[in-house]
Amino acid sequence: MKRYAIYGAGSLGTVLGAYITKSGEKIDLINRNKAHIEALKKNGAKITGAVEMTVPVTALTPDEMSGKYDVILLLTKQLLNAEVVSFLKDFLAEDGVIVTLQNGLPEPGIAEIVGSHRTMGCVVEWGAALVSPGVCELTSKADSLSFHMGKMEGISDAKFAEVKALLERMCPVHEETNLIGARWSKLLINATFSGLGTVVGGVFGDVSESKAARKVAIRCMKECIDVGHAAGAEFAPVQGKNITALFYYKTAFKRALATMLIPIAMKKHRSIEPSMLQDLKKGKPCEIDAINGIVCHFGKACGVKTPINDRIVEIVKKCESGALTPCAENIKLFDDLL
């Protein structure tokens, strides 16, 4: 019998695990958060928001793991990858794979530890939030859920089909031949709306529906596109939309037009609370270096200036240290860059 696990079953992983379990497939939900795991064991996974359901699930802490898994869906913070992936390597079946559903560009680092033939990447195009132990909110509209999945060299067609079928128990899975392009497209969305959402202390809609924030957002998008292109990436469509055609500009007129499109494009995802903001609220370090920070990193390497992303990193790090608090007033900290 095949064995499946979600490692780092927080908000996204609990929602995904509930869908997969409800469909009749067995999967272990694993998290270091003992209160969350105990609540899942006692009450099942309660999902609110775009859907309402409570599903009995199999939940474990890492010290309760045993045996080998054929597929491990990885949803921990990328900050911990070296430690986590090295730990998971011992629980991976000989032909098993780690499928990273994380933000940023995580595949190369994982492949260094377990091999490219055991590494797959998946872009998550929906959001969720942990409300309380055992309770998660699906914050994207139910008709806008999807995955974009690609594979690295050495993954068999059979293994790819197996993972695809597993994830399709929740929502459509698009086979992505341009995984790097899909990663950069998701990075653009995260850098803009998770980055700025964290700065202003709000959900994606607080960025997309604010005139002041949109002025910053469109410039953040352009920086991401410029850097991605300089790094050799061809941006993949996001849920059928060509984001470079929609949001890239070279003239003030196109910039104004693209800015107007932001709230329309983000309408179905307006309620997503940035995972970085969720981390700050819990007093945890966030993934700013793996999101906006990676844009800045590639910008420097490719000779592309990234003043908006640099400022987002600076502000979020100040929020981490307590020197600043995420709030709407923080958008004024970009005025000198506009």
Predicted regions and their residues:
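Internal alpha-helical scaffold of NAD(P)-dependent oxidoreductase catalytic cores
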Residues: 91, 113-118, 135-241
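Nucleotide donor/acceptor-binding cores
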Residues: 2-3, 70, 145
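NAD(P)+-binding Rossmann beta1-loop-alpha1 motif at the extreme N-terminus of oxidoreductases
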Residues: 1-52
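NAD(P)-dependent Rossmann-like dehydrogenase/reductase catalytic/cofactor-binding core
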Residues: 2, 218-338
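Rossmann-like NAD(P)(H) cofactor-binding subdomain of soluble oxidoreductases
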Residues: 52-137
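Short, charged/polar "capping" segments at the starts of alpha-helices
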Residues: 35-39, 107-109, 157-158
